[in-house]
Amino acid sequence: MRKINGFRAILSPQFRLVRIQGRIQGQAGLRFVEEVWKETGRVDDAFSGMPYDDITAAIDYYFENYNDGRPFIIAAHSQGSAIAQIVLANYFKEHPELNERMIAAYIIGYGVTPEYLEANPHLKFATGEDDTGVLISWNTEGKKSIEENADNVVVLPNSISINPLNWKLDDTYAPASENLGSLVANEKTGEPEIRDIGADAQLVLDRGVVLSNGEFDFDAVPEFLKKIFGPESFHGNDYTFFYNNIKENVAKRVEAYLANQ
């Protein structure tokens, strides 16, 4: 347990990432994820077993020893969000009292689908900027991926996204002027800093992603990952592009939750 970014305490459980033939993550693990995705349309099976067991063991220990009945927020990304969906579907179904204390689950960088929500009626997707007990998700892409309708391992068919600047579910455009600041590396020191990089946001509803049109001075995705994520996926920037807006949104949802207690 640790304190960070103005929050009282953060649990950051460690888990074993996707393995294949004894090699961890890297291109081998990603190829395995891609194979599972092509066979099933989801990558859940790639994360079953040890990763899921690691997470549930950590969650059990946290709620039994540290939580003391307090409300909480879930934040995850990519593989973590895929596992979080499994946890929310299974563990939270077995422990319904936790749903009442969950302020929100930011499970970003892996698609949430209507089929998933229908199969898990105890879960609901966010509809605005301050509803609580909700799931929040998006995947960020550039024009090239969208124009080519490129395969992206984390963008599932029928994915639902919310706009991280205006917190709407429609395709209302949010210009970069609504972005409160992105988290980027300082060009000289390499240290993280908040800067305006021109990251706007608009939902592309038929693909279920957030389109960001900024003129960014870095590659969207490494060359060896383009086969899996597409030519212009901003997967690694799902949080950082909209960093200060997310921080503000967390505060609004906490305030709304506490106001209803």
Locate each region found by the language model.
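Short, surface-exposed "cap/lid" segments of acyl-processing enzymes
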Residues: 1-22, 29
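Soluble non-cytosolic domains of exported or imported proteins
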Residues: 2, 45-53, 78, 236-240
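Structural recognition of the beta-strand scaffold that forms the well-ordered cores
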Residues: 19-24, 73-74, 104-107, 136-137
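Cap/lid segment of the alpha/beta-hydrolase catalytic domain
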Residues: 29-44
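Helix-loop module immediately N-terminal to the HCX5R catalytic loop
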Residues: 40-70
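Surface cap/lid and interfacial helix-loop subdomains adjacent to catalytic sites
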Residues: 57-68, 90-242, 247-252, 256, ...
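Gly/Ala-rich beta-loop-alpha elbow adjacent to hydrolase catalytic centers
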Residues: 75-84
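Short, hydrophobic alpha-helix immediately C-terminal to the catalytic nucleophile
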Residues: 85-89
